[in-house]
Amino acid sequence: MKVINLIPTLTLTSLIILTLPITMTLLQNNKTNCFLYITKMAVTCAFAISLIPTLLFLQSNQEAYISNWHWMTIQTLKLSLSFKLDFFSLTFMPIALFITWSIMEFSLWYMHSDPHINRFFKYLLLFLITMLILVSANNLLQLFMGWEGVGIMSFLLISWWHGRTDANTAALQAMLYNRIGDMGFIMMMAWFIIHLNSWEFQQIFLTNPKNTTLPLLGLLLASAGKSAQFGLHPWLPSAMEGPTPVSALLHSSTMVMAGVFTLIRFYPLMENNLTIQTSTLCLGAITTLFTAICALTQNDIKKIIALSTSSQLGLMMVTIGINQPHLAFTHMCTHAFFKAMLFLSSGSIIHNLDNEQDIRKMGGLYKTMPITSTAIIIGSLALTGMPFLTGFYSKDPIIETANMSYINTWALLITLIAVSMTASYSTRIIFFALLGQPRYPTLIQVNENNPYLINPIKRLILGSIFMGFFISMNTIPHTTPQMTMPPHLKFMALAVTLLGFTVATELNNMTHNLTFKQPSRMHTFSTTLGYYPTTTHRILPYLSLTMSQNLATTIMDSIWLEKMIPKNLTTMQKTAASLVSNQKGLMKLYFLSFLLSITLGLLITL
């Protein structure tokens, strides 16, 4: 059998294995504990099988397309189920399966007391299937099905603890912001079906239509909603109300990458459209700076990591904006490892400290939780781009390529400022959570000696150290960037990172025991997330409701209910009363006048 035939066969085999636990729940009751282990084993087997087509592709460099089920025909439009197995899909699928395997094993420890843990695992598996459909889709309809699938599963998993009002509000907020982005996606689908009469990627890219600014703007809007870019970003920090495994899987390594992945998928249309490239660059630059500023003063450990995720997503958008989609994809893959590990480590701390998420109430955990502390330190160093960790192999080329770029200097400048802030908020987590004296109640028993907790974190530690090298070595850039930066400037990047660590540590030491009488405006701006939630979720609805109430009061009450009926009726009654009041009741005078008129008439006739 040829290599090209093995790739689709093994890929579909891994997808079929993932559907087996779902099928099992339809045939029999899934309330037994064995369902959890069957689901985890299915994901593990699918991961092992998915490695084979990935390695075969890297060896042969032959893409594969599967189109084996014709769905329906509408006039001249043929809709079919088709998969595109290229570098992007075959590289991302094993990464998604590996991270899901680790997070499911972590969930056996984190969610062990939840009475509905079987349903939780089923939701995670359904999300994974829809995510794999999204990355392997070969047409817009199938891509949209995966796109909506991950959105629905995100809604269900954020609101998992539906007894909490904040969780329900966060899930609804995520759904509404993503619906705004879906408007752009539907507009893009409508444009392509009107102008090209096809949703197949090959036909769209081969036709290469002109004036694609409108559909690509719709795609950018959709990606901004799904990947939490500026303007549509507030849902991502709020989504931390869900369980930590949900944050680790959906909101750091897979679902939020869907918007960036879709932009990477459409790079053949974007590479010649300077308007879209500039818009993507500026949007990503604003996002990465804004969310980095907001992360500097947050005290919730999960929100700090969530805002750093949004900042890294902005960095990926910047990379796409400077026409380096393969570099953005490399950063997307490497980022998944250490960000999932950071979330699992924070979940370990939160669970051991009785659901405490404030980093000011932690401290001294490097003694009681050494493995978790090691994971947080390695993840933070990888996030800052420390040499020879996973993040270095993608973040350093992005910075170098951006510095050598000659377009939109202000966007590149604020991107570099945002990248330098990464070391500050990473050091802040390490300083407050791991160092110093314990600030949590002494009665809390901290224990991380559980294989379901330690093993996933250990696997992700290995991925955060070694996978960046392997991914970067097998990624061929679409356009070769001009690497003309002098060596001393390259060392300056490392020096700036170390300087950020040093400054953040000194500031934390200096201000640790100080109390601020009145925070500065910049501190308040960062703490309140740039006043964005207050403006969009409080002030604008308040103004809208106030205006609606005033209009309703003025039109309904003052005009209709008051003027039209009571006052108008009173006016009519006054008019009738004035007419009636002219009758004085002087009967003798009336009869005398009547008699005089008759007499005068008779005299005239005579």
UniProtKB/Swiss-Prot annotation:
One of its GO terms (cellular component) is mitochondrial inner membrane. Its EC number is 7.1.1.2. InterPro entries: NADH_DH_su5_C, NADHpl_OxRdtase_5_subgr, ND/Mrp_TM, NU5C-like, Proton_antipo_N. It is a multi-pass membrane protein. GO terms for biological process: electron transport coupled proton transport; mitochondrial electron transport, NADH to ubiquinone; mitochondrial respiratory chain complex I assembly. Disulfide bonds: none annotated. Pfam families: NADH5_C, Proton_antipo_M, Proton_antipo_N. GO terms for molecular function: NADH dehydrogenase (ubiquinone) activity. The chain crosses the membrane at residues 3-23, 38-58, 87-107, 124-144, 180-200, 216-236, 244-264, 276-296, 304-323, 328-350, 369-389, 404-424, 460-480, 483-503, 586-606. Keywords: Electron transport, Membrane, Mitochondrion, Mitochondrion inner membrane, NAD, Respiratory chain, Translocase, Transmembrane, Transmembrane helix, Transport, Ubiquinone. It is found in: Mitochondrion inner membrane. It catalyses: a ubiquinone + NADH + 5 H(+)(in) = a ubiquinol + NAD(+) + 4 H(+)(out). Belongs to the complex I subunit 5 family. Core subunit of the mitochondrial membrane respiratory chain NADH dehydrogenase (Complex I) which catalyzes electron transfer from NADH through the respiratory chain, using ubiquinone as an electron acceptor. Essential for the catalytic activity and assembly of complex I. Core subunit of respiratory chain NADH dehydrogenase (Complex I) which is composed of 45 different subunits. This is NADH-ubiquinone oxidoreductase chain 5. It comes from Elephas maximus.
